[in-house]
Amino acid sequence: MNGFGRLEHFSGAVYEGQFKDNMFHGLGTYTFPNGAKYTGNFNENRVEGEGEYTDIQGLEWSGNFHFTAAPDLKLKLHM
């Protein structure tokens, strides 16, 4: 698949965004089965670059993501 699309996994995870060669690649949103969500850049199925992560408590974190590492994330405060 190439271009924009949506993939629903049997686990409950959902990816909606850009695909390249059947991989998450470009801008997209990945919703985890537990309800947490990442929105941002993907590179060959891996989170890579600027993005936002919303955890299961609704806290929003933003910053640079590099596959399994996300140094210097910033918590967004809503007042």
From Swiss-Prot:
MORN repeats lie at residues 15-36, 38-55. Transmembrane segments: none annotated. It holds the Pfam family MORN. Its main location: cytoplasm. One of its GO terms (cellular component) is acrosomal vesicle. The keyword Lyase does not apply. It is found in: Cytoplasmic vesicle, Secretory vesicle, Acrosome; Nucleus. PANTHER family: MORN REPEAT-CONTAINING PROTEIN 2. This is MORN repeat-containing protein 2.
